[in-house]
Amino acid sequence: MAKASEDTPLLRQYFSIKAQHPDALLLYRVGDFYECYSADAVTLSKVLGMVLTRRNNGEKGDTEMAGFPHHALDTYLPKLVRSGLKVAICDQLEDPKLAQNKLVKRGVTEILTPGIAFGETMLEGKEHNWLAGLTYDGPECGAAFLDASTGTFRVAQGSVEYINTLLYSFRPSELVVQRDVWRTAREKYPEFCITPLDEWAFVPDAAREKLCSQLGVSSLKGFAVDRYPLAVCSAGALVSYLEQTHHTGLRNICSISRIDEGSFVWMDRFTFRNLEIFQSNSGTEGTSLVDVLDRCSSPMGSRLLREWLSLPILDIRALNSRYDVVQFFCDNEEALDEMRSRIRSEE
C-alpha cells in the first residue's frame, strides 16, 4: 500500500479503517451507497457478479471500485457472508450536511461472519448457525458451540478424537482457534471456515471472566462447567470474539450447558455422510433423512429435530418418554391439531 499522504482524503480514511480490519471485506458508506476499493472491490465484484469500476485517487491515479445502493444491503450481505467472508460495515457517524466541507466521520458499526449472523435474511431458520471455538492442550481439547441468534451455548471437553466427532455433529459455520494453531487447523479441517483469534482470549482467567460477565454470574459452578477449563477457555474466547465484532449486550446468551460424552451415540463424518442424515449423496436432487422427517410446525422444532439427529441419546427412559409423547399425539388427533395451531400462531 502506498503512503497515506498520496491518497485522496476519502480513500485515506478508507485505507485507515481498512487497516484496522485487514481480514474483513469493508463496506464503506458513501452517501447512498456502500462501496469497496482496491482488493476488496475485486472480491465484491467476483462474489456478487458486479461490474468493477474505478475511482480517482489523486496522484496515485485510479483505484478499483465496486458498490451497491445502501437499501440493497439486506440483499447482498447474506450472499457475502454465506460465501465465507467476514464483512465489516462502515457507516457515516454524522450527518453529511453538518460536516461543512469536512470529511464525514465514519466508523465500523458491525462485523458479520459466517458464524455471527442475525435476522431472517441472513439465516436458515430451520438450522442452528453454530459458531465454534477450540482450545488444545496436548491430547485433550475443549470446545464451545454458540448459536448467537438463539442464545444456545454448549461446551465439551475430552480427547481430540471426541471433539472432532462433535465438530461433524454440529457442523459449525465458523471455527475460532488460537492464532498459533490457525494454519494447522486449516489443514486439518479444510471444510470449515476457520478464524484466528489472539492467544490472550483463550487464557483461562481472562476467558472465565468474559464468560461470567456474559452470563451475569460470579461463578460457573451453577452451570456444572467449572471443572472443564479447556471448554471454559473456548467459551470465553467466543464471547471475546463477539465483542470484537461489535456484538455486545446479547441478553439471549444467558445460560450454558455441557455435552456429556457418555449420553449420546457418536457418529463420525463418514457415518453422517453414508447414512445421508443431513445431505443426500445424490446432491441437490436427492433427499436426506432430515428432509423426510422434518414436518415441524416451527423453525425451533426443526432445529431441535436436527439436534436430536446429530446427537442421538442413549438413555432408554428419555427415549421412551419421547415415544410416549409421540404415541399420545398419534392417539389424539384433535390435540395434535390444536398444538400445531398454537405453535404456528407464535411464529
Feature-to-residue mapping (PLM):
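Charged catalytic and DNA/RNA-contacting regions of genome-maintenance
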Residues: 2-332, 337, 341-345
